[in-house]
């Protein structure tokens, strides 16, 4: 009986002596065969064959006795029972590695070039590494003889015939199954075709009914749509007429609005340019602060680096100190050892001296005894001389040792001095380190302060921007109201009219920003060219100090504000309109005037208590001489006017913007 254990196609490298090496796909089969005549034996059969070349055949039958000789030759550690499985494992490793570019396990078949030679071919299983190619197993296979090839071909033909028979049986069974299935499917197809015809007929009848219904519904819907269309056309024409009338009105309104907006746009552009210049200045300051911040950062990094270098130097010096301490300990130990040696030598000297004394005593005794013992005395004297020489040598050794000890003591003293110096330098460096750390902390605190300053400056910038916006709104509203009131006074025949009763004065003591004349009173003539001195536009710094931030230009004037004029014939040549406010509010140097964009005319920056009012170009009339007002409050500029008596019937008008004060304005 033969059991097939392994049968696979492997890639084997074929090596010939006289031809080139090549690789071929060879089928390797491993079988276990048991024979019972005359003794029950187990044999392992290894066969190499090629599916493309039927005459390529190599066989090996390996019994237990053959395996023992193979085991001894190649130093195998496996028994015959476990050998087939181990051999198959190695073959599986070769199959796994054969597709890699550099395989670890290789199969090699070394054979002679002449097939007629009955030389065995060796099948080698090789493990490759960068150092050496190791042969794990080498099996010698014999080339198949004619009878073996015939037997192999006969078995192959038998196997093919068996496979052919089984395939024919399978084909016959599959044909029968398919024919049965075909019949069933054809019946099902016929039934489905009948159902399809029925469904088509039903669908045609339903479609005809639905088309008739839909045509009726479409006709009705068309009639409804025509009626609705006529209604909508009528409504559309009416709406069109209404829209045309409304659009014409809105167009006129928008044209007037556009003209107003263009004027406002001009004012806003001028304000924009001024605010942009202010922003540039602030950006310059910000860039300077940022540069200082970067410098401080760089200083901090450099100080940190210096700190790191100092730390490393400290560690190195500590290591040196430890090394010197160990050296001193070693030297102390050596000094102790030398002291022990000196003590021993001193003991030896003492013992020698005692021996000398004993010898002297014996000498005296022997001299007293007899002269016969002179020979012995001579020998003893020689021994004494030798002992003295030994003592002298020991004394010289002692002196040398003492000198060495002195040298070592001097060396230790020097090392102690060096250690003291090193400790002093270490303390100095520690002090320097603490100083550097302290400086670093100071720099970090400065950095934090700079950051806080930067944050505060940014907050102030935002606040100033918001304040600018509110100030601009207030200035626009104030200038607009001033212009309207002045133009109204100029256009009237007598220049004076009473304000509504709601705009009466409340009191001048509690209000801030009162407008009053600081110059002497003046008279008004009947000259048509004579006008009242006009105030300059109000600065943004003044408004930001005396008006709240949420003040909007669209708000109505407060009811407590009134506008009035006071006439005085004594001052005929000069007049000046000023805001009456405390000197701390307007003239104090601590209050920093903020730049504000102009409305319709540029605003002169007020460094001191300058008079404020409207610009001259707002007071020009068509075909008339431009109105001249007073420039600054510092010089006594006059407006030449014809002296005239004031009208007796004109009542004083209270100021709408500055409650509690009557404006001293002449009638035109």
Curated annotation (Swiss-Prot):
Subcellular location: Cytoplasm, Cytoskeleton, Microtubule organizing center, Centrosome
Cysteine pairings via disulfide bonds: none
Keywords: Cell cycle, Coiled coil, Cytoplasm, Cytoskeleton
InterPro entries: SAS-6_N (IPR032396), SAS-6_N_sf (IPR038558), SAS6_CC (IPR041513)
Domain of life: Eukaryota
Gene3D superfamilies from the UniProt entry: Spindle assembly abnormal protein 6, N-terminal domain (2.170.210.20)
Ranges in coiled-coil conformation: 182-482
Keyword Lipid biosynthesis: no
Principal localisation: cytoplasm
Record-level GO BP terms: centriole replication
GO cellular component, one term: centrosome
Stretches the record annotates as Disordered: 623-668
Domain PISA intervals: 39-91
Domain notes: The 35 nM long coiled-coil domain mediates homodimerization while the globular N-terminus links the dimers at an angle of 40 degrees to form the inner ring.
Function (record text): Central scaffolding component of the centrioles ensuring their 9-fold symmetry. Required for centrosome biogenesis and duplication: required both for mother-centriole-dependent centriole duplication and deuterosome-dependent centriole amplification in multiciliated cells.
Subunit structure: Nine homodimers form a cartwheel structure with an internal diameter of 23 nM and radial spokes connecting to the microtubule triplets.
Protein name: Spindle assembly abnormal protein 6 homolog
Organism: Xenopus laevis (African clawed frog)
């Amino acid at each position: 009986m033969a059991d097939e254990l392994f049968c696979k196609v492997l890639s084997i490298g074929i090596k010939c002596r006289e031809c080139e090496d090549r690789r071929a796909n060879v089928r390797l089969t491993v079988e276990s065969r048991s024979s019972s005549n005359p003794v029950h034996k187990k044999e392992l059969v290894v066969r190499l064959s090629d599916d493309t070349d039927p005459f390529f055949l190599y066989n090996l039958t390996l019994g237990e006795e053959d395996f023992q000789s193979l085991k001894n030759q190649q130093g195998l550690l496996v028994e015959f029972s476990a050998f087939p499985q181990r051999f198959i494992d190695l073959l599986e490793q070769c199959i796994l590695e054969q597709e890699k570019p550099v395989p670890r396990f290789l199969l090699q078949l070394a054979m002679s070039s002449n097939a007629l030679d009955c030389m065995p071919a060796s099948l080698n299983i090789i493990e490759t590494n960068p150092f050496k190619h190791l042969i794990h197993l080498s099996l010698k296979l014999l080339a198949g003889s004619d009878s073996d090839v015939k037997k192999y071909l006969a078995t192959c033909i038998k196997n093919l015939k068996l496979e052919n028979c089984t395939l024919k049986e399978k084909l016959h069974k599959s044909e029968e199954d398919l024919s049965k299935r075909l019949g069933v499917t054809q019946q099902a197809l016929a039934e489905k075709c009948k159902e399809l015809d029925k469904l088509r007929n039903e669908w045609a009848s339903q479609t005809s009914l639905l088309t008739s219904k839909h045509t009726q519904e479409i006709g009705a819907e068309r009639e409804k749509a025509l009626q609705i269309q006529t209604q909508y056309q009528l409504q559309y024409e009416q709406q069109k007429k209404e829209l045309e009338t409304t659009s014409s009105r809105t167009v006129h309104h928008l044209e007037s609005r556009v003209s107003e907006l263009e004027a406002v746009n001009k004012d806003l552009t001028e304000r924009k340019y001024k605010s942009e210049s202010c922003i540039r200045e602030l950006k310059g300051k910000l860039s300077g602060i940022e540069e200082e911040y970067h410098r401080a950062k760089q200083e901090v990094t450099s100080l940190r680096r210096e700190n790191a270098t100092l730390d490393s130097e400290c560690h190195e010096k500590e290591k040196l100190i430890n090394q010197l301490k160990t050296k001193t300990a070693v030297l102390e130990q050596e000094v102790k050892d030398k002291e022990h040696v000196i003590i021993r030598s001193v003991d030896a000297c003492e013992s020698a001296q005692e021996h000398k004394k004993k010898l002297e005593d014996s000498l005296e005794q022997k001299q007293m005894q007899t002269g016969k013992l002179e020979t012995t005395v001579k020998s003893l004297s020689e021994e004494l001389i030798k002992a003295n020489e030994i003592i002298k040598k020991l004394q010289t050794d002692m002196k040398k040792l003492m000198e060495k000890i002195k040298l070592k003591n001097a060396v230790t003293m020097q090392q102690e001095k060096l250690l003291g110096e090193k400790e002093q330098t270490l303390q100095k460096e520690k002090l320097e380190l603490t100083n550097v750390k302290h400086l670093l902390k100071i720099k970090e605190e400065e950095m934090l302060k700079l950051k806080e300053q930067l944050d505060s400056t940014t907050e102030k910038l935002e606040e100033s921007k918001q304040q600018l916006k509110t100030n601009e709104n207030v200035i626009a509203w104030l200038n607009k109201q001033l212009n309207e009131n002045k133009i109204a006074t100029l256009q009237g025949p007598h220049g004076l009219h009473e304000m509504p009763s709601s705009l009466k004065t409340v009191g001048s003591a509690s209000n801030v920003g009162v407008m009053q004349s600081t110059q002497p009173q003046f008279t008004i003539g009947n000259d048509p060219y004579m006008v009242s001195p006009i105030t300059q536009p109000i600065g943004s710094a003044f408004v930001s100090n005396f008006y709240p931030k949420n003040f909007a230009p669209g708000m109505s004037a407060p009811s407590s504000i009134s506008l009035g004029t006071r006439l005085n014939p004594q001052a005929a040549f000069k007049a000046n309109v000023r805001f009456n406010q405390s000197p701390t509010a307007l003239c104090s140097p601590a209050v920093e005037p903020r730049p504000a964009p102009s409305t319709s005319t540029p605003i002169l920056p007020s460094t001191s208590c300058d008079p404020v009012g409207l610009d001259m170009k707002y007071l020009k009339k068509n075909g008339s001489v431009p109105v001249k007002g007073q420039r600054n409050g510092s010089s006594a500029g006059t407006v030449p006017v014809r002296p005239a008596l004031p009208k007796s019937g004109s009542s004083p008008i209270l100021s709408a913007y500055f409650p509690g004060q009557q404006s001293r304005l002449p009638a035109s």
